[in-house]
Amino acid sequence: MPYHPQPSQIKAYLVHGDYRPASTFVCSDVDLNAIHDMVNYTLRCLTFSGYMVDCPHLERAGYGGDGNSSTQAFQTMYDAAPTYMNWLQAWGDVMQEDGGLPHVAPAGGGGGGPYWCGFIVLAPWRTYVNYGDSRLLERYYDNMKKWFGY
């Protein structure tokens, strides 16, 4: 840039998925309210691409371990069932013929362990528990069995 912009000349935009809130939280403890607001902001920042990413500025990879760690919070705070329908489709697509799974979907690759690949099992189950929606369990049950067999 040929000049140093002033703060009043700079605009920033939060790019995120259009999620309908599923719950609210307010309490008398300002610190807990602040923590809740930070978690809310973080989840919005990490779910702008149809699946949850590990960070919005580096890899932007859909690690299963990150998904497993945050599914409960994300699904409690938002109606995120469409995101999980999309993301589980990606996990089904990257499954290998022998039942093996990478640690990341949709791109594949990454590093981790069973907790990362286990997203194919835990995400459909948690979606059922949190929303009463059994479609992911029905759709990916064979994938789950295949992965367990691997």
Task: Give, region by region, the residue ranges found by the protein language model.
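Catalytic cores of large soluble enzymes that bind and process phosphate-bearing ligands
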Residues: 24-27, 31, 62, 76-80, ...
